[in-house]
């Protein structure tokens, strides 16, 4: 996938968040699902709705990370009982390790601790993280999508 397409998709994920249409996990998942030709119906975004703000406001795993792992599952996850899950697990770990290296933590409350919750600075931090993770997930997909 070319850098122009990645940048456009990042901008779309950030816009969904900035316009308050979706939060981190939902924005990222929606953009990747659409990019892949919607292997699952758009309504499946509901599955990502509990992940924002670190698992339902708990401040734990960042929603951009969990949404990214869900999005990778669209391409690498298994769809039948008993199928091999090794690639999906490896891709999830790869994204997790990259995220930790990139941001210093996978914990939402650590990533936003410098900002007042709900402030414009907090929003921009989360939008930036969502965009950056969207880019990484797109780079982890096969070249043909």
Predicted regions and their residues:
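Helix-adjacent hinge/juxtasegments
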Residues: 50-83
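Phosphate-handling active-site elements
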Residues: 35-46, 72-91
């Amino acid at each position: 996938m070319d850098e122009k397409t990645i940048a456009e998709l990042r901008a779309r994920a950030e816009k969904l968040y900035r316009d308050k249409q979706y939060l981190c996990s939902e924005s990222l998942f929606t953009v990747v699902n659409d990019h892949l030709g919607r292997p699952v119906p758009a309504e499946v975004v509901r599955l990502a709705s509990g992940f924002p703000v670190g698992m339902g406001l708990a401040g734990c795993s960042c929603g951009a990370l969990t949404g990214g792992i869900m999005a990778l599952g669209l391409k690498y996850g298994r769809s039948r009982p008993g199928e091999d899950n090794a690639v999906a697990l490896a891709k999830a770990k790869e994204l997790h390790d990259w995220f930790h290296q990139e941001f210093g933590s996978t914990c939402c409350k650590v990533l936003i601790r410098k900002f007042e919750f709900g402030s414009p600075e907090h929003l921009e931090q989360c939008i930036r993280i969502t965009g950056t993770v969207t880019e990484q997930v797109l780079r982890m997909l096969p070249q043909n999508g």
